[in-house]
Amino acid sequence: MSAKIIRIATRQSPLALWQANHVREMLVKQWPNLSIELLPMITSGDRFLKDKLLSAGGKGLFVKELEEALLDKRADLAVHSTKDMPAQLPDGLLLTAICKRDNPFDALISPQFKSLAALPKNAIIGTSSLRRQSQLLAYNPNLQIKTLRGNIHTRLSKLESGEYQAIILAAAGLERMGLAHHITQLIPDDIMLPTCAQGALCIECRTDDLEIQELVHGLNDPISALCVHTERRVNAKLGGNCHIPFAVYCTITEEKLLLLRAKVLNMDGSQMIDDEQQGKIAEAEVIADRCTESLMTKGAMSLLSTIPS
């Protein structure tokens, strides 16, 4: 392996820096003589944190500048939360590794109430995710959803100030930051199905950089990668992004079968189309396509057309 310094592009948020350092530590463990530097960057998504992602341009804003750094060779690889990745990558880039998936579920945080079921009528719940909003309202239409933005610490501070009675965050982010003690309830996936690739870190690099691909290959977790790419296939075929209330989650059963579940909702949760497919691991792409076709047959695209663009 070359003696050059490897540069990792990352967002500047505390969670993103933790994730980049985590990947750095795993690489150094495999390649002890490796020299690695972080290249922290402020992305468009970070600048628009106070705005609605719908109007700001969506989840791709959190990776755009990092990908530009890869393409102009200021960075050798980029570390992302895979859930932030658009369905389509720019030409010249690929997801080289999907790290072992952490907790994929959503967490309720509330200083007053012990579960979703305990929330009173008209309780104010903080989230900026249409997926979470629609599933919350499908579970309990009497909840009041209020926009919540900022990094993890900012969101927790807003909860503590009394602005909300509860907030919803990704469990993985809280656990990575040593904040799992704030979790009141891990929300069951029959109430709130995760978003595509939630809980999984990915490493992106240039398609022509075979040296970097070899370097990070050992960080790829085959089962996590299989499940994440299956979810992303459904997401891509439905035109999925953070503009739509869409959830998809793939797991491997005890019987070593691939189980794929997906759902599409309208914004207030009053309408939902869901599907579940199961089959052999080797048929992951077929299962993903079958799930997509089933959702479409049931009217998913018509339902999604009701969502403001």
UniProtKB/Swiss-Prot annotation:
Q: Which residues are reported to carry the modification S-(dipyrrolylmethanemethyl)cysteine?
A: C242
Q: How is the cofactor bound?
A: Binds 1 dipyrromethane group covalently.
Q: What is its EC number?
A: 2.5.1.61
Q: Which domain of life is it from?
A: Bacteria
Catalytic activity of the protein: 4 porphobilinogen + H2O = hydroxymethylbilane + 4 NH4(+)
- A family per Pfam: Porphobil_deamC
Q: Name one GO biological process term.
A: protoporphyrinogen IX biosynthetic process
Q: Which InterPro entries match?
A: HemC, Porphobilin_deaminase_cofac_BS, Porphobilin_deaminase_N, Porphobilinogen_deaminase_C, Porphobilinogen_deaminase_C_sf
Cite the annotated pathway: Porphyrin-containing compound metabolism; protoporphyrin-IX biosynthesis; coproporphyrinogen-III from 5-aminolevulinate: step 2/4
**What is its cofactor?**
dipyrromethane
Matching entries from CDD domains are given as: PBP2_EcHMBS_like
Kindly list the GO molecular function terms attached to this UniProt entry. hydroxymethylbilane synthase activity
- Which cellular components does GO assign to this protein? cytoplasm
Recite the UniProt keywords alphabetically: Porphyrin biosynthesis, Transferase
The note filed under miscellaneous reads: The porphobilinogen subunits are added to the dipyrromethane group.
Similarity remark: Belongs to the HMBS family.
The protein's role, per its UniProt record: Tetrapolymerization of the monopyrrole PBG into the hydroxymethylbilane pre-uroporphyrinogen in several discrete steps.
Subunit structure of this entry? Monomer.
Give the protein name, as stated in the record: Porphobilinogen deaminase
